[in-house]
Amino acid sequence: ATGTPEPVAANAPEIVTTTDLRVWFPITRGLMRRTVGHIKAVNAATLSVRAGETLGIVGESGSGKTTLALAIMRLIASQGPVMFMGRDVQGLHSRDMRPLRRDMQIVFQDPYGSLSPRMTVEQIVAEGLAVHGVGRADRRAQVAEILTEVGLDPLMMDRYPHEFSGGQRQRIAIARAMILRPKLVVLDEPTSALDMTVQVQIVDLLRDLQRRHAIAYLFISHDLKVVRALSHKVIVMRN
């Protein structure tokens, strides 16, 4: 991947900040399941990401990169404040988290594994809209719009994932995340399953979407070239 990210606006608001965030998994022993220690998957992570900014998260396998991102999104339990758009979401009930979910999205490494083979592109991309109560007619129009934005022909929306190439499937996964116009998107190795030419295209697309919509990215990768092309700042996680 080549190029560099767009500069972040001087007045860009903070989207997410953490202070000494921890994810510790208990080690239990015996019949009473007594806790005898902890696996410290993430220990004292302090970070901040502003609108239109990308934080690259690098580290070897098992260093806690994805665990950190899932904790920020409140998809796994953690300790320590997580401020999202000025609000501490750490103690929020799932009912109170639900309205915030549309502002936090994720794009996974394997586009084929994350797309249901039994659903059409329209159904896949519109899934979030349906959850948040958008009507069918509006959903189809919004799917057409976002498919165009990610470089796919809206006439393809009635097809199934197996009819697309790996790069096209990743564009579908990106469209699914972006259709809700989120403030924060976690990109979990989104280019690692793609060949070099397609990687460059996907990085260009992600940069373009960020520039247009001032999205904050948490970009997880082990590929430093791609990290440099997309990230404004980088944290390194170690075992």
Placement of each model-derived feature along the sequence:
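A short, proline-enriched helix->beta-strand linker immediately N-terminal to the Walker B motif
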Residues: 179-183
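Conserved ABC ATPase signature
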Residues: 160-164, 168
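Hydrophobic anchor residue at the start of the ABC signature
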Residues: 174, 202
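Conserved ABC transporter NBD signature motif
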Residues: 80-88
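ABC ATPase NBD coupling module
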Residues: 31-36, 89-105, 131, 136
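A short, surface-exposed alpha-helical micro-motif characterized by mixed small hydrophobic
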Residues: 227-229
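Conserved ABC ATPase "signature" region
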Residues: 88, 137-155
